[in-house]
Amino acid sequence: VMADESVCTPYDAMRLAREQASHVFSLKVAKHGGLLRTRKVAAIALAADSGWYGGTRLETSIGSAASAHVFATLGGQHYNCELFGPQLLVDDIVTVRMAVRDFEPQLPDGPGLGIEIDLQQLARFARALAGSQPQHFDM
């Protein structure tokens, strides 16, 4: 059994670990609130002898590169990952998308996250430059 939406915070991970409710934790950097919180959730999973699966939130190459880097730092039982978000996008804001070979994402190895922002693409996608204003919707 893999915990996905039921494990967003380290508190959720502790609860699931105590209850032995899952054999695998789905890790998603955006879902957990960043790289460090993802590592905290992973540490709890590993301490509970659970495995982990690297998931995605259909982010750009920036998010996928960040996820790839944090997943590369984790040990323990690994149940693959899915970092296909950039492959679903028509355009992206990086000069070169993260490579995938033999169904495996290739960890970028340049400075920082190993990616380079395409400033022309960034300007193209910026709402303020396109003439529209950000809107807030109450839910």
Q: Which ranges hold each PLM region?
A:
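Shared catalytic-loop signature of beta/alpha-barrel
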Residues: 2, 7-104, 108
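C-terminal extensions of enzymes
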Residues: 88-139
